[in-house]
From Swiss-Prot:
It comes from Turnip yellows virus (isolate FL-1). This is Major capsid protein. Transmembrane segments: none annotated. Major capsid protein that self-assembles to form an icosahedral capsid with a T=3 symmetry, about 23 nm in diameter, and consisting of 180 capsid proteins monomers. Most of the 180 monomers are the major capsid protein, but a small percentage contain the minor capsid protein, which has a long C-terminal extension. Residues 10-24, 38-49 have a biased composition (Basic residues). Residues 1-64 are annotated as: Disordered. Keywords: Capsid protein, T=3 icosahedral capsid protein, Virion. It is found in: Virion. Residues 25-36, 50-60 have a biased composition (Low complexity). GO terms for molecular function: structural molecule activity. GO terms for cellular component: T=3 icosahedral viral capsid. Pfam families: Luteo_coat. Belongs to the luteoviruses capsid protein family.
Length: 202
């Protein structure tokens, strides 16, 4: 006996057999993304600074300062010397101030200015001479001079004033001598600027 199994035809196509096993539903995959810890570059601590930001002086530290002072009431016939170092009484902030706090110093520049206070009818001049080793007691040359009726200015750098090496604070570095050939009336004043360096604090 022949058994005929009927198959259902829909729209001219055979209907596929229903699969007895259902397709397994894929399990959801949970991805946990961990945040990457950012690595901070260590800060470089500046030399000479502590945690509070204050400057910590290191051994042998120094300082640079500029001083301006004047020598007033110069007569047309005045003469004298300005000694730069502990003998500089015209600038106590330098001689009795900074020099007391360090063991060594050097003056790297000096600017000598003449401020005229004489009338145009006066005559004469004030000669000056640089003594880089403090050996002269009086003016030996009158080549360099300021006329008393007009202002003048002269600058000396370190190589001229014995300022390339350190000096003990107990010794003077250099000297400027001056002498006028005018009358006894007031001729003007000197305005002096010095640039200094200090080394090895006490």
């Amino acid at each position: 006996m022949n058994t005929v199994v009927g198959r259902r035809i829909i729209n001219g196509r055979r209907r596929p057999r229903r699969q007895t096993r259902r397709a397994q539903r894929p399990q959801p995959v949970v991805v946990v993304q961990t945040s990457r810890a950012t690595q901070r570059r260590p800060r470089r601590r500046r030399r000479g600074n502590n945690r509070t930001g204050r400057t910590v002086p290191t051994r042998g530290a120094g300082s640079s300062e500029t001083f301006v002072f004047s020598k007033d009431n110069l007569a047309g016939s005045s003469s004298g010397a300005i000694t730069f170092g502990p003998s500089l009484s015209d600038c106590p902030a330098f001689s009795n101030g900074m020099l007391k706090a360090y063991h060594e110093y050097k003056i790297s520049m000096v600017i000598l200015e003449f401020v005229s206070e004489a009338s145009s009818q006066n005559s004469g001049s004030i000669a000056y001479e640089l003594d880089p080793h403090c050996k002269l007691n009086s003016l030996s040359s009158t080549i360099n001079k300021f006329g008393i009726t007009k202002p003048g200015k002269r600058a000396f750098t370190a190589s001229y004033i014995n300022g390339t090496e350190w000096h003990d604070v107990a010794e003077d570095q250099f000297r400027i001598l001056y002498k006028g050939n005018g009358s006894s009336s007031i001729a003007g004043s000197f305005r002096i600027t010095i640039k200094c360096q200090f080394h090895n604090p006490k």
